Amino acid sequence: MTKNQTWVTEFILLGFPLSLRIQMLLSGLFSLLYVFTLLGNGAILGLIWLDSRLHTPMYFFLSHLAIIDISYASNNVPKMLTNLGLNKRKTISFVPCTMQTFLYMAFAHTECLILVMMSYDRYMAICHPLQYSVIMRWGVCTVLAVTSWACGSLLALVHVVLILRLPFCGPHEINHFFCEILSVLKLACADTWLNQVVIFAASVFILVGPLCLVLVSYSRILAAILRIQSGEGRRKAFSTCSSHLCMVGLFFGSAIVMYMAPKSRHPEEQQKVLSLFYSLFNPMLNPLIYSLRNAEVKGALKRVLWKQRSK
């Protein structure tokens, strides 16, 4: 970088301000959780692929959610694990940082929309069972999934384009363990008003709007479940819907606290903890929630294991 050129070409990720020993312990713990995330979501994908009884719209959307969780964790966690326990400067170049921000936003937006599609699928299955097979055809499910990915990626691209128009001339220390968009914007040498407005508008469109749709869907689903005469049918419907509601609560709850709730005295540390939920804990917990609370997934696992033993 020459004397007359002050543009930042790389950033320093400050990560967690902890002692080296604690960072090494966290590195081991987070590595273990990351492996569980890959194995759990990989197992969900494998079961859906191998068991024909899971070839339904609900598990089609669940497979997309598993792909998002694997991608989400793989975008943020490896860099964090590399930096944990290092005494030297933890740098990341501008282009990889921008790419990490794009992928982070794309996966987050897409997961919001996929969760809405899953709630719509449950609404049709429980409230309109006679029309379910006609409306939720494979072609329709594919269009809904592709639309979710396209909208999520397009919104993320808008955020990145608005970041690229900003000058970064120092400081160059990101108080985070990855290139989270709010932390990156704090380093800009120009007014970020437009970026903040777009982030707020996107939060309303991609967070508040979908959450309202999910809540409306489940209010009608709950009313329909309570009208079911069969105790077994009621338990099965509650089991499937409660798994999805747990996932919705984890994802939207942490997102609302992070982007829309009043900031604490230590907003940077709050963002780091909440980002851990996004990047590591939520992706790890989603397959556990579905495997422990969903009878169909547990049944599929038993059938797959039985086939392997019979060979």
From Swiss-Prot:
GO terms for molecular function: G protein-coupled receptor activity; olfactory receptor activity. It is a multi-pass membrane protein. Keywords: Cell membrane, Disulfide bond, G-protein coupled receptor, Glycoprotein, Membrane, Olfaction, Receptor, Sensory transduction, Transducer, Transmembrane, Transmembrane helix. GO terms for cellular component: plasma membrane. It holds the Pfam family 7tm_4. It is found in: Cell membrane. Glycans are attached at residue 4. Residues 1-24, 79-100, 159-196, 260-272 are extracellular. Disulfide bonds join 97-189. Odorant receptor. This is Olfactory receptor 2A5.
